[in-house]
Curated annotation (Swiss-Prot):
Protein name in UniProt: Acetylglutamate kinase
InterPro entries documented for this protein: AceGlu_kinase-like_sf, AcgluKinase_fam, ArgB, Asp/Glu/Uridylate_kinase, Glu/AcGlu_kinase, NAGK-C
CDD domains named in the record: AAK_NAGK-C
Predominant location: cytoplasm
GO cellular component terms given for this protein: cytoplasm
Species, as recorded: Alkaliphilus metalliredigens (strain QYMF)
Gene Ontology biological process: arginine biosynthetic process via ornithine; L-arginine biosynthetic process
Catalytic activity: N-acetyl-L-glutamate + ATP = N-acetyl-L-glutamyl 5-phosphate + ADP
EC number of the protein: 2.7.2.8
Known function: Catalyzes the ATP-dependent phosphorylation of N-acetyl-L-glutamate.
Organism placement in taxonomy: Bacteria, Bacillati, Bacillota, Clostridia, Peptostreptococcales
NCBIfam families hit by this protein: argB (TIGR00761)
Disulfide cross-links: none
Length: 316
């Protein structure tokens, strides 16, 4: 699309209030899906992240890497096993996971950011005992659930002018590595950092009223509307853990959480810097009586529906 000079000026002017609003604010980005595989989409995401830094925001990137891990397991002739959609992670699988996430995926993201003129550094949750975890389920092996996050290391990296890129690997009670769901890392990290926004880059347009019609996109959801959307089947299957992640972040102080289609070029910029935005935005809302459900009530709601159509792989 070719824009006239006046149209280009209009686009820049439209973005100005948002640049002011998010200047010097932390934005946590969960980077996954097709945008990690397609070279054009990779470059689009990286340029979005770099531009965010140049206009004064502080992007923090948490990445996935499920397809790359699966491919590497095949190279080592090791079968991928799943329980309720979660990858069973024995010691050998954990070592391969670390090799892929830290040695390949994270380094590629860091290199691409550096090549675009902004300094970046790659770390994982074990560095500085940043993300502490415990085993989620003995049947899953070294799959971890987050118990605490120490943000000092990330804040230091941000203060030095770097973009932190974080691999979803946690530190267990005995110092062992745990494979963590990247959505969970992003959501809890956003809350711990006091981020202004959480952005989940996915392979869907957002929450759809009709799963087969992207025109049915729901652009704005309040937290008090989530239960009804789950009960009526609008939010289901693979969308439930993402909504759960967004809810957890918003309930703990993050102003807005977004589910964004990473298959579309520059989708993050469109969400942040335009009036219309893209994807689905989740913001805080009380229940019908003006009160918020407590976290235990919400966890019960999410867990009740979570594995009806299990999909999510830890660390993805």
């Amino acid at each position: 699309m070719n824009l006239s000079p006046n149209q280009k000026a209009d686009v820049l002017i439209e973005s100005l209030p948002y640049i002011k609003k998010f200047y010097n604010e932390i934005v946590v980005i969960k980077y996954g899906g097709s945008a990690m595989v397609n070279d054009e989409l990779k470059e689009s995401i990286i340029k979005d992240i770099v531009l965010m830094k140049y206009v004064g925001m502080h992007p923090v990137v948490v990445h996935g890497g499920g397809p790359e891990i699966t491919n590497m397991l095949k190279v080592f002739d090791k079968e991928s096993k799943f329980v309720d959609g979660l990858r069973v992670t024995d010691q050998a699988t954990m070592e391969i996971t670390e090799m892929v996430l830290l040695g390949k995926v994270c380094q590629e993201i860091v290199t691409r950011i550096n090549q675009n003129g902004v300094r970046s550094i790659g770390i994982c949750g074990k560095d500085g005992s940043m993300i502490k975890t415990v085993p989620k389920d003995p049947e899953l092996g070294l799959v971890g659930g987050i118990t605490s996050i120490d943000t000092d290391l990330i804040k230091t990296i941000i203060e030095k002018g770097y973009i932190p890129v974080i691999s979803p690997i946690g530190c267990g009670p005995a110092g062992e590595s745990h494979n963590i769901n990247a959505d969970e890392v992003a959501g809890k990290l956003a809350a711990a950092l006091g981020a202004k926004k959480l952005m989940l880059i996915t392979d869907v347009a957002g929450v759809l009223r009709d799963q087969h019609d992207e025109a049915s996109l729901i652009s704005d959801i309040k937290t008090n509307e989530i239960e009804e959307y789950i009960e009526t089947g609008v939010i289901k299957g693979g969308m439930i853990p993402k909504i759960s992640c967004c809810f957890d972040a918003v309930a703990n102080g993050v102003e807005r959480a977004h589910i964004i289609d990473g298959r579309k070029s520059h989708s993050m910029l469109l969400e942040i810097f335009t009036d219309q935005g893209v994807g689905t935005m989740i913001t805080h809302g009380g229940d019908q009586n003006g009160n918020s459900k407590n976290n235990k009530q919400w966890k019960s709601i999410f867990n009740e529906h979570l594995w009806e159509n299990a999909y999510s792989l830890p660390g993805r």
